[in-house]
Structures are given as C-alpha cells and as structure tokens.
C-alpha cells in the first residue's frame, strides 16, 4: 500500500480537484458549524465555536468563549466567503474580532443579508447564521481530504503541504504539491499509510503521529456517516505544536438519507435552489438550474445531457437539466413544466422523450395539461420517439395547441434555439409576442 503513496501528476491533480467540486454539488452539504460539531463529536482537535442566529446571540457567544481573539464567519454554503461581499455593503464573510461588541456589529451586517461570492453568482445566498469561533494561530498549514474517486472505485486521500488556499489553484499552479493516496475500502485507512502520508505532507516530527491520528478519526467519520467528501482546509500545526482542523467541509451521500443518523436533519434548504428542492422532494424530479434560456424536459440522465449538448452545438444555452425518470405520470410532467416555466429567463422549451419504460402518450397528456392549466405562453418544441408514440402524436394533434412536433432531434434543437432567440430579442426590447405554429 505504501507504494501507492505517490506524487500526483499534472493530469491527476485537476481531476481530483474536480472531484471535490462535484461532491459538494451533487450530495448533501452542511454548514461549517455542523461540520465542526461533528469533528468535536469524534474527538478531533478543532477550534471552539458557537453558532448564532441573531446579533445578540453572537454577542453572548463571544462573551462565553472568553477570549479577545475571535473570528466571525458567515454560514453560507458557498466557497470564497472571505473574498465575498454582502448586500449590506460589508466586505468579506470572515472577519477578525477583538471584542463581543465588534462581533455583534459584524453579525448585524451579515445576518439577514445576502453574501455574494464567485460561487453564488450575482444573486448571492442568504446568511441566516454566523459562527463565532476562537482564533488559532497556524505555524504551518496543510490541505487534507478523503474523497470517493470513481477512477479508482474507492476512497482516496488528497493531501498537500499548501493549505489555506483553494486546492483547485494548487492543482493548476503546482500540481506536484498534491499527494494522492488511493486505498481499499475493504482494508480501510491503515495507521501505516496514515503515518507515511503525514510524513510526505511535511508535518514536523512531533506532529506526524498527531496528524496520523487525525486522519484515522476523519476516516471513521467518512465511513460511519456515509460521507462522500471530508475536506479540511487548512489542517494546521498551531503555535503550541498541536495539529488542529481549522475549517471543515463535508459532503454526504443522498442515498443514505433513509438512515436514522441525524445528518440529513442538518440540511439547510434555504441554501439550495427552491426549484431543485421542490422537484426532488415533492415530485421525484431530477432538476438542476442553469443560466441559459432554453428549458429542457427529458427522460434519462444520459439523454438529458445529450439534449443539452445538441442545444449548445446549435448555438443555444440550456436553462436547466431535468430528468423526469422512466415512470413519470402526467401530473409529474405538468409539475416539471411548472418548475421550468418559473424561471423567467426561459424563452422556449424543448421536450425530448425516448419512450422505453416511459410511455410517450403519458408525456403528451402531461404536456397538454401543462399548456392548458399553466397558460404557457412560450414556444414549445416536442420530440417524441418510442413506446406509444403514435398515440402521443394523435393526442397532440387533437389538442389544437400550438406546439412544434419534430421527430428529428437535430432539427428540434435548431428550431428551439431559433424560437428562443426570437422571444429573447423581443423581451430585451419590451415587445410582447405570441408565436403560433
């Protein structure tokens, strides 16, 4: 196993950095204070902190910590908090403080306001909590993560002597500084591998055993809590010669949500796209919002991705990924349209269904219901193939609705891009138009 502890190549580093991003996006993420509480639960050395949801609570938390060295951190599920800004005018979501009064003042400018970072986009995200934490001084900073890696089909340690910065930046500028250690989930993380990794990361001799112990505890969390990612950035040696996890990010497997472990009770849906929450929780629809103007309703994740690709190839930009699955009802299809049309940027919609398990006539019924009941006034291109397709075409024909029924996918994509461009141009100029087939 020790032979597997190798320096990452320039190709592997960006790939593993990408894993970290994907894990956070695909699976449940929890706030920093929840992650830190979990570290304390497993006796991992981490700074003391208290969560607060009002300025007064923040003030009391600062007094309780009883130190003049404090940090207040906005609890928003997005990276780049320190370099972000609030709609209140406050610059930065991580602030050093020296008095409880200063903590209270910063809390009043964070709580109830939106934090805008590179990851949130211009819309920002609501800050409903702050984490007041004791400040610790790092003599050395490292990066450490445990991820699930599809390439090796198991867990992998990703570590670096360059902590406290974005791992993606390290991967770009100095990929040789990243250490990757795949290991078997059957044998788990052994102490031998943990010690060797700590040495290769550059921990001082005194701190190597502490670091290895920390790695083992983090792996225990990873396994027992069904994590897909455990990321510590930075992991530090403080000025007292102790290994401390200064910040933590966890991702958890959505497929484990049925287990009574309490992790999924920590989900903060205010930090998620409400359309994604509604689609998944209420209607079992796999929806991901994007920034384009062409809505997509497709069955099957692969076909959905191919549909987005062909829209892009024809010069359009998808507004969403939406997979209705193989057993959707007409009601679910209608609700899918409701979610898509709630995005004011959508100028046209492409329905692309290949009926295997999914019947085309069911989709057609849902399309007709949606257009009639929701009063959809944007162009709709429908491409249906497969089971019950003739019945579906007959339903659409008899509905007397103004739909574009096109069998060829490339032609359907071209048409929806053309229509979206026309409607988009009209919107920009304040002109209301109605396109009829």
Curated annotation (Swiss-Prot):
It comes from the Eukaryota. Residues 1-27 form a transit peptide. ATP binds at residues 73, 80-82, 141. GO terms for molecular function: ATP binding; magnesium ion binding; succinate-CoA ligase (ADP-forming) activity. It is found in: Hydrogenosome. Succinyl-CoA synthetase functions in the citric acid cycle (TCA), coupling the hydrolysis of succinyl-CoA to the synthesis of ATP and thus represents the only step of substrate-level phosphorylation in the TCA. The beta subunit provides nucleotide specificity of the enzyme and binds the substrate succinate, while the binding sites for coenzyme A and phosphate are found in the alpha subunit. Heterodimer of an alpha and a beta subunit. Belongs to the succinate/malate CoA ligase beta subunit family. This is Succinate--CoA ligase [ADP-forming] subunit beta, hydrogenosomal. It comes from Neocallimastix frontalis (Rumen fungus).
